[in-house]
């Protein structure tokens, strides 16, 4: 079974922009290693001839009545926004012009 090192967890944390303590790095290395072991065990199960399914039990689709409820109006939603322009949410630009 592959062992996940503390350095690999530190690298993943850096890529994810997570600040982890040394204790957390050791803890997560063990937990991730356990998860990899569980996945490996599942991959080794002989599932030949097993029909794919979404749920182990037969469940009839249940439908609920479509009822219209009062929702938040635009003015109330915009009232909670940090920035509004021309009646719309104003957000920072993430793409350059022409993108």
Curated annotation (Swiss-Prot):
Disulfide bonds: none
Recorded coiled-coil stretches: none
GO molecular function, one term: asparaginyl-tRNA synthase (glutamine-hydrolyzing) activity
Record GO biological process: glutaminyl-tRNAGln biosynthesis via transamidation; regulation of translational fidelity; translation
ATP-binding keyword on record: yes
One Pfam entry name: GatC
Catalytic reactions on record: L-glutamyl-tRNA(Gln) + L-glutamine + ATP + H2O = L-glutaminyl-tRNA(Gln) + L-glutamate + ADP + phosphate + H(+); L-aspartyl-tRNA(Asn) + L-glutamine + ATP + H2O = L-asparaginyl-tRNA(Asn) + L-glutamate + ADP + phosphate + 2 H(+)
Keywords of the record: ATP-binding, Ligase, Nucleotide-binding, Protein biosynthesis
EC number(s) recorded for this UniProt protein: 6.3.5.-
Top-tier EC class: ligase
Described function: Allows the formation of correctly charged Asn-tRNA(Asn) or Gln-tRNA(Gln) through the transamidation of misacylated Asp-tRNA(Asn) or Glu-tRNA(Gln) in organisms which lack either or both of asparaginyl-tRNA or glutaminyl-tRNA synthetases. The reaction takes place in the presence of glutamine and ATP through an activated phospho-Asp-tRNA(Asn) or phospho-Glu-tRNA(Gln).
Similarity comment: Belongs to the GatC family.
PANTHER family: GLUTAMYL-TRNA(GLN) AMIDOTRANSFERASE SUBUNIT C, MITOCHONDRIAL
Subunit text: Heterotrimer of A, B and C subunits.
Protein name from the UniProt record: Aspartyl/glutamyl-tRNA(Asn/Gln) amidotransferase subunit C
Protein's organism: Corynebacterium glutamicum (strain ATCC 13032 / DSM 20300 / JCM 1318 / BCRC 11384 / CCUG 27702 / LMG 3730 / NBRC 12168 / NCIMB 10025 / NRRL B-2784 / 534)
